[in-house]
A protein has these predicted regions:
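A glycine- and Lys/Arg-enriched "phosphate-lid" helix/loop adjacent to the NTP-binding pocket
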Residues: 100-169
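ATP-dependent small-molecule kinase phosphotransfer cores
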Residues: 32-124, 197
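Hydrophobic positions on the alpha1 helix immediately C-terminal to the Walker A/P-loop
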Residues: 19
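Conserved lysine of the Walker
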Residues: 16
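NTP-dependent small-molecule kinase module
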Residues: 22-24, 140-214
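Hydrophobic anchor at the beta1->P-loop junction of P-loop NTPases
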Residues: 8
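Pre-Walker A (Motif I) flank of P-loop NTPase domains
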Residues: 2-5
Length: 214
């Protein structure tokens, strides 16, 4: 079993951070090193970009500006966190990566995918995840989950439902276009059931043990 670079993607309210933590804990029970990280974030620069992009002040940030800020944070994150972790044989579990840019700024805001891909290629140096886990949830359910905790609501959560539907559709299109590199999980189920489905999906593609302690 080779430690891999696995990214959790999906629309808002899918439970990415919860399921990432569950998977990390499960992998650690079999003795592997696991690095948990997120985008934007993972580095001092990334956390500063995260605060800027997700803050609730009334300053309008253009979609093109979002792309460039995210790319800058991603370039730092890849080289400072992800590549070194991979080099020492650790699992890297990341909450969002390049596909979120394609879904949010591409699908949601309508920016050209070809341009986005060129920027991401430069930012990542061509680094590609071994697998993506798409935690899919209908927009109405996902946003209701997010707004149930007012303290956690961010700028993206306040975008229109139509915007979030475009984002979800873009994620589903990305997964359908490359099914060997995606595990699509119905995230409307309970936390334990979703965790089991995530593990089964990874086991099918990354030769994980079929059964392990949860």
């Amino acid at each position: 079993m080779n430690p891999s670079f696995v990214v959790f993607e999906g629309p808002e309210g899918g439970g990415k951070s919860t399921q990432l933590a569950r998977l990390a804990a499960r992998l650690r029970t079999i003795g592997d090193e696991v690095v948990e990280t997120r985008e934007p974030g993972g580095t001092r620069l990334g956390n500063a970009v995260r605060a800027l992009l997700l803050g609730l002040d009334d300053y309008a940030i253009l979609p093109e500006t979002e792309v460039l800020l995210l790319a800058a944070a991603r370039a730092q994150h890849v080289r400072e966190v992800i590549v070194p972790a991979r080099a020492r044989g650790a699992w890297v579990l990341c909450d969002r990566f390049v596909d979120s840019t394609y879904a949010y700024q591409g699908g949601g805001h309508g920016l050209q995918i070809e341009q986005l891909r060129a920027i991401q290629e430069y930012a990542t140096g061509g680094l590609d995840p071994d697998l993506r886990v798409l935690l899919d949830v209908p927009v109405e359910i996902g946003l209701a989950r997010r707004h149930a905790d007012p303290a956690s609501v961010n700028r993206i959560d306040l975008a229109s439902a139509d915007f979030h539907r475009r984002v979800r559709g873009a994620f589903l299109d990305l997964a359908a276009a490359d099914p060997a590199r995606w595990v699509v999980v119905d995230a409307t189920a309970g936390v334990d059931e979703v965790a089991g489905l995530v593990w089964e999906g990874l086991a099918d593609r990354l030769t994980l043990p079929a059964r392990s302690h949860r």
